[in-house]
A protein has these predicted regions:
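P-loop NTPase catalytic phosphate-binding loop
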Residues: 1-36, 40, 154-262, 276-359, ...
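Acidic, low-complexity cytosolic linker/stalk segments
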Residues: 30-68, 404-406, 425-447
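N-terminal "pre-motor" subdomain/linker immediately upstream of P-loop NTPase catalytic cores
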Residues: 35-162, 172-173, 331
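Conserved ATP-driven motor cores of ASCE-family P-loop NTPases powering translocation/secretion/packaging/pilus
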Residues: 114-115, 126-129, 135-137, 143-155, ...
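Glycine/charge-rich, flexible interdomain linkers and switch-proximal surface loops
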Residues: 131-139, 263-276, 327-329
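Amphipathic alpha-helical surface "interface" segments used
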Residues: 264-279, 428-438
Length: 450
């Protein structure tokens, strides 16, 4: 019995250490909840004031406070760090709410985020301004982008909201496409960068919403043709794309007439019974629309680019949104490229082959994010840098979604596909759903005898 007790005394700690090591490698959320979060919380609590002081995030106390500390409390007057309002643990890290003293701004804390990360031993520290004078430190305990798991709890918006969770940010929150706030977006990425995965997640999310999806895929529809059950229109050649964009411009003008008749400036101000269905135009390989090798094709290109710019400038008010994707995008594409880019507020740039494409994608809104794009490794497909016109940016990664899964979602919600008369000529043919190989036939053959 004593031998068994000795074995258990030795084996139990070894098994515990081995289990923690396995959890750290295979189940980082479990390891963080059991070990990482308590250790980091204690380290933050006991080293907060000293860390803020050495990182330059303290200010001199006011004259009144210095007088009270020196003469009433009989203590040494120390610099004042930001006041900790709240500390909250999550499955991916810590959330710390700080009240900034007079003399500090959120940019000061953001500039010291790398030093704070090393001081507290976390994977990353992101600074978000929640309201004037208050910031939130979003600490991530491990690399959440190595294995993407979307947050389970999502904020539910109103019934008419157009919010689609697409990817996971490096701070553990969901990256969403909110078409009411950011109506148009530009997504860039080279081959095998994860751009197609991003598109599949976006289409699968939009398929569940009461919107119309318009596809423009000049690769003969090899990317978007499989989603025909949920598409209201599909163009597979540059000529068809030009015709389809012309129809969309006419639809935009008709909707503006509807707004003028009811004296409103936005489609969402109309009564629900009169409100036309929102349309999301998904453009794949936008560079194909700019290419021309003959005089006739140049006329088609100029017409197509002009129509896209018109939609990007005015279509938001009537509920038509652009989602433009491509492998590369530069001013050398021709006239109208920079004008179109200026109207696309949202930017998502995956790994690209040239720095010019990264500059065109993010250089005008977040120049410091360009260097982050060029460091995306090729062995991590789906990683991208997302930014907008506010200057903020973050790294994101799209969860894996196979084409078959995206097609299944489109077939499930095919009943939401709106029937628009003007788009009827471009309605793609829907192939019947293939029958599983192991399914039994409905009718059994009967042999014919004499």
């Amino acid at each position: 019995m004593s031998d068994l007790s000795s074995v258990l005394e030795i084996a139990a700690p070894l098994a515990g250490v081995g289990g923690l090591g396995y959890a750290k490698a295979r189940a980082p959320r479990v390891y963080w909840s059991l070990v990482g979060m308590p250790v980091t919380w204690c380290r933050f609590t006991f080293t907060y004031r000293a860390t803020m002081d050495v990182c330059g995030l303290t200010v001199r106390p006011s004259a009144l406070r210095a007088f009270l500390v020196r003469n009433v409390a009989r203590r040494e007057v120390l610099p004042v760090p930001p006041k900790v309002r709240r500390v909250r643990g999550t499955s991916t890290g810590l959330r710390v709410t700080l009240r900034l003293p007079a003399g500090l701004e959120p940019a000061d804390v953001a500039a010291a985020s790398e030093r704070l990360r090393h001081a507290w031993g976390v994977h990353s520290v992101n600074v978000v301004e929640t309201k004037p004078g208050v910031v939130e430190l979003r600490m991530t305990g491990y690399d959440v982008l190595s294995r993407v798991r979307m947050p389970r709890r999502r904020r539910r918006g109103p019934a008419d909201s157009l919010v689609v969770p697409v990817a996971l940010r490096d701070d553990g929150t969901a990256f969403v496409r909110d078409y009411r706030k950011i109506p148009h977006s530009l997504t860039l990425g080279s081959n095998q960068s994860g751009k197609s995965m991003y598109q599949r997640n976006l289409i699968a999310g939009l398929a569940k919403l009461p919107v119309g999806l318009i596809g423009i895929d000049c690769k003969r529809g090899v990317e978007q043709g499989r989603f025909a059950s949920r598409l209201s229109a599909l163009a597979t050649t540059p000529d068809e794309a030009s015709e389809l964009l012309g129809v969309l411009v006419s639809e935009m003008e008709d909707r503006f007439n509807l707004l003028a008749d009811h004296q409103v400036s936005d489609v969402w101000e109309l009564p629900e019974k009169l409100r036309p269905v929102p349309l999301v135009v998904l453009v794949d390989e936008v560079a194909e629309l700019f290419l021309a090798s003959a005089k006739k094709e140049e006329e088609r290109r100029d017409r197509t680019v002009t129509q896209m710019i018109r939609l990007a400038q005015m279509a938001r008010a009537v509920g038509i949104y652009l989602e433009v994707c491509g492998q590369r995008f530069g001013s050398d594409l021709g006239k109208g490229a920079t004008s179109l880019r200026a109207q696309l507020t949202g930017r998502v740039v995956h790994r690209v082959n040239d720095k010019q494409t990264a500059d065109m994608g993010l250089g005008d809104i977040a120049p410091e994010a360009v260097s982050s794009v060029t460091t995306i490794p090729p062995d991590r497909p789906g990683v991208a840098v997302a930014g907008d016109s506010s200057g903020g940016w973050s790294r994101i990664r799209t969860p894996e979604l196979t084409p078959a899964e995206a097609v299944a979602v489109c077939r499930e919600y095919a009943h939401l596909t709106p029937r628009i008369a003007a788009l009827a000529p471009f309605r793609p043919a829907v192939r019947p759903e293939p029958m599983p190989a192991d399914s039994a036939p409905l009718a059994r053959p009967v042999p014919v005898t004499d």
